[in-house]
Every structure is written in C-alpha cells, then in structure tokens.
C-alpha cells in the first residue's frame, strides 16, 4: 500500500 504522505 502506497501512502502519498509518508515523507
């Protein structure tokens, strides 16, 4: 699952 606000 990719999280757009992980950085």
Swiss-Prot record:
The lineage of its organism: Eukaryota, Metazoa, Chordata, Craniata, Vertebrata. It comes from Litoria rubella (Desert tree frog). One of its GO terms (biological process) is defense response. Its main location: secreted. The modification Alanine amide is found at residue 7. The keyword Hydrolase does not apply. This is Electrin-5. Signal peptide: none annotated. Keywords: Amidation, Amphibian defense peptide, Secreted. Expressed by the skin glands. GO terms for cellular component: extracellular region. It comes from the Eukaryota.
